[in-house]
Amino acid sequence: DVTCASLGYYDWYEYDDLDGNTAATTIVVDIASSLGVLCVNSAGNEGDDPWYYIIAPADADSVISVGAVNRDGTIANFSSRGPTYDGRIKPEVCALGVSTYCVRSNTEDIYRTASGTSFSAPLAAGAAAVIMSANPEWTNMQVREAIMMTASLSNIPDNIYGYGILNTWAAINYQFTTGLKNEEIIPNILKVFDAY
């Protein structure tokens, strides 16, 4: 299952509370993740405000927090930044969140554009659902890893874009590192002698 939330709180918190363990909403996200749910959350729209940083529950260590970029891939000024208080890179990834098309709330057939990480997070959640459908044997955390490790800046992540702009096709085809196989292990030939 994939959940997507565009909620965030900092009113009751200080920056040092964004450690992935303090905020109530962060704890709930971690519980849901431990039960196999892939949780996607907007990073927040505080990038050009005094707060600046991501907001809870985007600080959870099991969430995919999503920042916003414009159509040319440049970070939106409002997109909240990392790191978490304990130094983890945030957001995990970015998606289009500037001038995204959506249906007007009071009609069924009139579209408008809107901006915010509340519009980038659903795009990432939809991508995550596609990745899960293509790889039903993967766990929620494997899907999270695939999304992060195939994003545009996965080799040089930062606290503005995180691991970069997500790439659904690359994530679908991601190959996990499985480690050494038994036949590749070299036996230890060290001999131990008794001391004199």
Regions found by a protein language model. Give the residues of each.
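Sec-exported extracytoplasmic/periplasmic mature domains
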Residues: 8, 30-34, 44, 68-71, ...
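Hydrophobic, small-residue-rich alpha-helical packing segments that form membrane-like cores
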Residues: 5, 22, 28, 32, ...
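Hydrolase catalytic cores
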Residues: 1-3, 97-161
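Structural recognition of the beta-strand scaffold that forms the well-ordered cores
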Residues: 1-6, 30-33, 38-42, 64-67, ...
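Active-site-adjacent substrate-recognition loops and nearby beta-strands
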Residues: 11-20, 41-63, 67-90, 102-117, ...
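Residue-level detector of functionally pivotal "anchor" positions at catalytic/ligand-binding pockets or at interdomain
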Residues: 172-195
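Extracytoplasmic/secreted envelope proteins and their assembly/folding machinery
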Residues: 26-30, 54, 63, 75, ...
